[in-house]
UniProtKB/Swiss-Prot annotation:
Keywords: Hydrolase. Substrate binds at Y143, R150, Y203, R216. Its EC number is 3.3.2.13. The active site is at E328 (proton acceptor). This is Chorismatase. Pfam families: FkbO_Hyg5-like_N (PF21168). Disruption phenotype: Cells lacking this gene are unable to produce rapamycin. One of its GO terms (molecular function) is ether hydrolase activity. SUPFAM superfamilies: YjgF-like. Belongs to the FkbO/Hyg5 family. Monomer. Involved in the biosynthesis of the macrocyclic amino acid-linked polyketides rapamycin which is a potent immunosuppressant that prevents T-cell proliferation through initial binding to the immunophilin FKBP12. Catalyzes the hydrolysis of chorismate via a 1,4-conjugate elimination of water to yield (4R,5R)-4,5-dihydroxycyclohexa-1,5-dienecarboxylic acid (DCDC).
Length: 334
């Protein structure tokens, strides 16, 4: 009997963990640390390091796994590994004065790769953007510059922004822009919105020449399976399209968690055709991004109170897409 297919899953490991050596389920490794590296394909596994924290004792490796025979390669700067059912890839936009063209090239490369290899369901993306709140060479904020490039890639390939999955767009302390993703060959992929927050690609132009494009969460399950993964986008203290509780990290953290709870709850999942529901206690492998180091203890306390004691939580000290946001939270529900 053929074993059932399971959706990709994540583990947080210590840097250099020996138990990753020879792991045939390993699809990709992203190291979060106090420096960055280039994208590589080591022993059939895409790897890179992103500069997402300022203390080495907060560093860790984000390891993505999937069952099944694996092969790997590279295509137009994207290092990738795949099983018969899932594809993981990593690419980098080099550091520079402008990012739109480089971002457009990376994303068109990703879209072409998933089409060529036959994994059309893009299920999750991450984008770590160096100097995210700083001006580019033309005076445009780097995050907005990035959003222009991503939107241009969608335009070039005729992709509806509403089909884009859960995503993270967060700061890094150097290294250009690192993009990585998960895509599926088949199965169910359901993108979800938050009824209390405006759909990202409908944000008004005050947030930039082109809006961000992502869903608030994405459900991914193998063909014919009842179980799967719910990928929760990096989620902030936003209601409608407005940042709330300016300068109050505790209140913003609470709203972030409330937004996650609303997205993953039974009422919202039912609205998107899924007969299931989750609570904050079901969210695991969370990454919590905090702008100011002095706020980390407050954020840790609130997360400890609201999340499961069994949850794996990594806190990273880095900038956030809007200058008035102090914290963002992402996670996975399995």
């Amino acid at each position: 009997m053929t074993p059932p297919v399971t959706a990709p899953y994540c583990r947080f490991e210590k840097l250099g963990a020996s138990d990753l050596d020879g792991d045939e389920t390993l699809l990709g490794v992203i190291e979060h640390r106090t420096g960055h590296t280039g994208v590589s394909l080591a022993e059939g596994c895409p790897r890179t390091a992103v500069h997402t924290t300022t203390r080495e004792d907060e560093s860790f490796a984000e390891a993505w796994h999937a069952e099944g025979p694996k092969e790997s390669g590279s295509h137009d700067g994207v290092a990738w590994a795949r099983t018969p059912d899932y594809l993981f890839g990593v690419a980098r936009v080099p550091e520079g004065g402008r990012y739109a063209a480089g971002t457009a090239a990376v994303y068109t490369g990703i879209f072409d790769l998933i089409g060529t290899l036959g994994y059309p369901s893009l299920a999750r993306t991450w984008n770590y953007v160096s100097g995210i709140n700083t001006p580019n060479a033309d005076g445009l904020e780097v995050y907005r510059d990035f959003c222009v490039g991503r939107a241009e890639a969608l335009d070039a390939r005729g992709i509806d922004p509403a089909t884009m999955p859960a995503a993270t767009g967060i700061g890094a302390h150097g290294g250009g822009i690192t993009c990585y993703f998960i895509a599926a060959r088949a199965g169910d992929r359901v993108n979800m919105e938050n009824p209390a927050v405006l759909t990202a690609h409908r944000y008004p132009q005050r947030y930039g020449p082109r809006p961000p494009v992502f869903s608030r969460a994405t459900w991914l399950s193998p063909p014919g399976a009842d179980d799967g993964r719910l990928f929760v986008s990096a989620t902030a203290g936003i209601v409608g399209h407005e940042t709330v509780h300016h300068g109050d990290v505790a209140a913003q953290c609470e709203v972030s968690l409330e937004n996650i709870a609303r997205v993953i709850g039974a009422e919202n999942l039912g609205r998107h055709g899924l007969r299931r529901g989750y609570a904050l206690a079901d969210v695991d492998h969370l990454k919590v991004y905090v702008r100011h180091r002095e706020d980390i203890s407050t954020v840790r306390r609130i997360c400890a109170e609201r999340l499961s004691r069994e949850a794996t939580v990594a806190v990273l000290h880095t900038d956030i897409a809007r200058t008035d946001l102090l914290v963002e939270i992402e996670g996975v529900v399995a």
